[in-house]
Amino acid sequence: IDAPDRRDDFEGIWRRLDRRLLLLAFGVEPDKVAGLPRIGVDGRPWFDDGTVEISLLVDAPVTATLRTSLESVGLRIEGSDPRRGIIVGRIPVDRLLDLAALESVRRATPSSGA
């Protein structure tokens, strides 16, 4: 029996992606989404060249295998606390739903430096 495609698990995706990220994933322009940060933790604009900076809560500890699976959906990891399962990184907006489909992702929210 084939495993279900988790991208079709809207309820799970809704729980994992912050509402603002979900709106972006559905194609809403960033300037139309209330409450988005202007600057990321990395000091760059939060929305930059089609990417957004996010904070993730994932299954702990963060292993090399988990990092590889996150990178395979387009996440560029900028920092982490492997023991606690916290990661900060940048991801293309069009890959947010792929990220949320990963079994190991618990929650994704916008990161903010300001």
Descriptions of predicted regions:
Residues 1-114:
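Autoinhibitory N-terminal propeptides
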